[in-house]
Amino acid sequence: FRREWLQYVGGFDPRFPPAEDTNLVLKLALKGCKTAWLREITVCYRQHESSAMHKGLPQAHSLLAVTDDFFNQSDLPSGVRLMEQSVRYGTLIWIAWYLYHTGHPKGMTEYLQQAWDYRPNSGIEALVTWVESFSEFARSWGVEFRINELTSSSEWQGLVQWMLKETNPIDQTVTNDP
């Protein structure tokens, strides 16, 4: 990013470690900063056990705070405002997977319960979406996803029981509409 753009949006916001980079990118995009995908490595970030990316709970809390801060802006364009439910849903699912991946299954459950309020489909379809999303996130990170390990965990079983209580019986039906 050019220095002028960083200064224009106020740089990194110290309220959001370790997700201040996500906040910065959102601010730049909202102000119209043009970007291009470079097909070469320009910066190398080494992930290790003590890096920010391996500290599950602080990363999760910070990313959710960034999302809340972004959508709490009163002057968001209507097109961006229309994406809020979808963005929140996807972000909460990613956070849940990330917490599962970093050894915080209780946190995973809490974030999937929050995602429940933003789901665009029935309860059963949401469950399928969550498993498919976890599989895709793991694949994109180059890690193995053990579906049986996830779905047989006490946290997942508790989540399913919670979901069944939250779901209307008619909502549990999956239709095959053409």
Residues of each region from the PLM?
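Conserved nucleotide-sugar donor-binding catalytic segment
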Residues: 1-66
